[in-house]
Structure formats: structure tokens, C-alpha cells
Amino acid sequence: AMIRWLKAQVDAGMAISQAVSWLDSLAEEASGLENVTLPGLNGSPLRAAQTPAQTRLDVRNSGALVRGVVNALLRFDEQQAEAILTEAFGLYPLEYVGEEIVTPALVEIGERWHKGEISVTMEHFATNYLSQRLAVLLRGAAGTQTGPLVWVACAPSELHEVGALLLVIYLRRAGHRVHYMGKDIPVEDFVQETQRARPAMVLLSASMPDVIPELATLTASLARIEPQPPLVGYGGRVFREHPELRDSITGMYMGDTAYEAVENTNERLRMGPHRTE
């Protein structure tokens, strides 16, 4: 809801810096971001006179931050990339940075690699840096120890984990009990552990078409777990770019972004059935 609200204000003509400052002001008045009641959800911002004064000078928009991160990583300039991301996290909510800066940067890097504009080494460095940066955030997002257990993993043979890491961070910040199971999970072993540990929901991420056959096998096997299979969801770039592939996967498509997946997870777990042991 928060990201949709920010986008609605920007779409209605408000500068993102004003929207974020407004959100900060609302959070301060409500004694915390989780207590904020967001006004103007229909996309109409308050009149300019009602918005808080801009409190940040020389704010760069998300597009400039994306370009800065990409250029720094392709120069192997880790220090500059870190400085830009630190700036971004200081300006915007974490979820906004994930959806509007980290994800677009990753997409641009991937597209440039596919076009042959950058080397495999450059792509690996950039992707690994972003994964490591998110892993630091993940360790700081403790989540909860109660409620339905959610497992998040990358598909078998899937080595790109940024999307899955973002999802785990968002879910924990939303109050869910989440375990991140890693990338390139083995089908048979994962099914056995799911049968034993009995998570309420399993969410799987994929980015490349060549992982789809194994992912299809895995989701079908998860659906056959007795006496009660977990809820199964899936998502990732490959399903945005090739929506026809969704027909081969058992379970629910969780949406085009990690943040949409959080909202769909909330809805599915409310509907049940789920386990809490």
C-alpha cells in the first residue's frame, strides 16, 4: 500500500521528494510508519499548501540513482555503488528502494548482458554485489517467531537470488515468519524437507526459462504432499516476460513484483488453510 501511495502522489504531479517528506511527516505524527493512515489513496494529493516543506536538499530521483548504481557497478566501483545505495536508503523507504532502484538496476544490467554490451564478469560482479547488499539487510530484518511459516527459495538451477531476497525482506518487515532456503534448491531433498517441516506456504522465484521444467516438477511434487500440501506460489522475471509459462507451474502466480507477492501472501494466508507448528 505504501509504494502504491507514493506512486499515486508522483503520478498526480507531486515530486517524489515531497511525497517521501510527506510520508515521513505522517509517520512522525503517527509515532511510526506502521501506524500511518495514508491520505489521497485515490491518487489525488493534498493541496501544495498542505504538504510539508521539502526537508532534503539536492534530492536525486530514482532514475538518477539507478543510473548511478549501474554505472558504478559496471566500473567495479563498489565504494561508489555503496555510497549511492546508502543515499537511496536514507531518502526513501526500503520497499521503494527495492522496487524502484535495486530491481530496475538489476534489469538494466541483465538486458545489457543479453545484448552483449557488458561481459559475464561485469554482470556477475554487479549481481553478486546487490545480492550481498540485500543479505546485509536481510540479517537486520528479524521478522517474527510466531504465525504461519513461509519458505522462500529460488527454483532448481536458478542462481539469481535478488528477487527472492527482496521478497524475504519485505515479508519479514510485514510481520511474517519467513525462512530463506537459498538458490538452486534440489527437487527431491526440498520436497522431503517440506514434508518434514510443513511450512504453511512455499514461494519460489525464477528468472530464466531453462529452469522452468525443474520448477514445474518441484511445484507438482509439493502439491502432492499429504495429508495437507503447503500453499505454493511462484514469481520472477521469466513469468513477467513469458506469461505463457505460468500454465506449466502448479500454484499461484504471486504478481509482477516482490511487493505484490507480499500482498498476495497476506491474502492467501488469511484465507488458509495453513499450519502454525
Give the residues covered by each predicted segment.
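Long amphipathic alpha-helical segments
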Residues: 1-142
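C-terminal regulatory/effector modules of DNA-binding transcriptional regulators
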Residues: 117-277
